[in-house]
Amino acid sequence: KGLTSASGIDVMTHAIEAYVYIMATDYTDGLAMKAVKMVFENLPSAYENGANDPKAREEMANASCMAGMAFANAFLGVCHSMAHKLGAYHHLPHGVANALLITEVMRFNASDRPAKMGTFPQYEYPHTLERYVECADFLGIKGRNNQEKFENLLAAIEELKAKVGIKKTIQEYGVDEKYFLDTLDEMVEQ
């Protein structure tokens, strides 16, 4: 079950990051959005029922492939960068590390704080909030305005993580807060 949940949330993170990344294109968008939807529709059953639901497992494999094709061309974001460090330093499965970071990274990315970081024409203005809202719309997540849709998307992701046994904090995975803080500078420099 742990492998199913960790790899399933990793698939979702691949797809969401590929969709909102500045190198996303019309070609990668369809793959990413379909993969996100497939994860929401199939991961809980693949997790709960395992081999007893081969269709859900097949759909998760397909979602993984589509998300992979999306991020191979659109690339990934800071969540994956940080998850690699967090997982390596604190011996957490990669998908779990992504799961622990994704909604906080999304909240940061959707804010006005990220500044223009490149010469890509797609990034003349930050657009991540709008892209996250498009994800919410595609998943049928409602809200009175874009900010509420975004918050509801975050809540849906948190609910999905809970359904598949992902704990809420790094500390719940046995990482001591003092040790985490002591290794933070070294993690960022690597």
Where are these regions (language model features)?
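Gly/Pro-rich interdomain helix-loop hinge
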Residues: L92-Y179
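Carboxylate- and glycine-rich phosphate/diphosphate-binding segment that chelates Mg2+/Mn2+
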Residues: K1-A74
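Short acidic alpha-helix initiation/capping motifs at coil-to-helix transition points
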Residues: K34, G77, E158-G165, T183-E186
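Short, amphipathic C-terminal "tail helix"
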Residues: D176-Q190
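Glycine-rich phosphate/pyrophosphate-binding beta-alpha loops
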Residues: C65-N98, Q190
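Amphipathic alpha-helical interaction segments
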Residues: G30-K34, M38, E59-N62, S81-H84, ...
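Glycine-rich flexible loops
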Residues: T13, Y19, A24, K37, ...
